[in-house]
């Protein structure tokens, strides 16, 4: 008969093996979409957008019609052409692909459609951030991350409002017009959606609203 100590060690060994198996499954769940991601074309929005519209609509190469719009909550008589640090913008979208996460942030407009928008003011959310955002919670930040995958929500991603319509809501607090990454008082910038790190080179969800900053 096995001694109590041996039974304990055997039980700990089984527990360790189970935990290792779970860790491998979770890691595969996270890494597989990144490894299998491939470019899916353009969002259909041209780089040159006239004026400072509060909404844009474009049909991507994937056949989805996406709409992006913004409401400046304290706009008074201003619009997106005269932003100041601390402005709060409620950003909404529809028609997005809910199987791929997106970042929402103020980023430099790229020189070509096949280039990634950025750098972005304040950077983009990182996977080192902890905390599931409660459904319906309003938390303003320089950038938001929207991803329905439960694993990424553990790192602070928001969920889509409606997967069927590809609808989301993000809450952006405008940072200073310049940081160590980009100076939006000198460069063309926009309030962007773009695919998150699970599909970084896929440009099909790159939509933006041009922004400017008050002098």
Model-predicted segments: where are they?
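Extracytoplasmic/secretory-pathway segments with low complexity and glycosylation-like composition
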Residues: 2-215
């Amino acid at each position: 008969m096995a001694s109590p100590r041996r039974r304990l060690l055997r039980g700990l060994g089984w527990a360790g093996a189970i935990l290792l198996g779970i860790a491998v499954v979770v890691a595969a769940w996270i890494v597989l979409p990144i490894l299998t991601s491939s470019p899916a074309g353009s969002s259909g929005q041209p780089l040159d957008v006239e004026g400072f519209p509060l909404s844009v609509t474009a049909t991507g190469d994937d056949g989805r019609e996406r709409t992006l719009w913004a409401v400046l909550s304290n706009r008074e008589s201003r619009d997106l052409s005269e932003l100041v640090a601390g402005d709060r913008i409620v950003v909404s979208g529809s028609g997005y692909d809910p199987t791929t996460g997106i970042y929402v942030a103020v980023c430099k407009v790229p020189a070509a459609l096949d280039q990634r928008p950025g750098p972005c003011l304040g950077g983009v959310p990182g996977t080192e951030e902890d905390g599931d955002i409660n459904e319906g919670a309003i938390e303003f930040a320089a950038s938001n991350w929207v991803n329905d995958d439960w694993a990424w929500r553990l790192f602070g991603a928001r969920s889509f409002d409606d997967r069927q319509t590809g609808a989301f809501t993000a809450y952006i607090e405008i940072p200073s017009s310049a940081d160590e990454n980009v100076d939006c008082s000198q460069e063309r910038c926009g309030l962007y959606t773009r695919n998150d790190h699970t599909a970084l080179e896929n440009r099909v969800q790159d939509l933006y609203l041009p922004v400017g900053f008050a002098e």
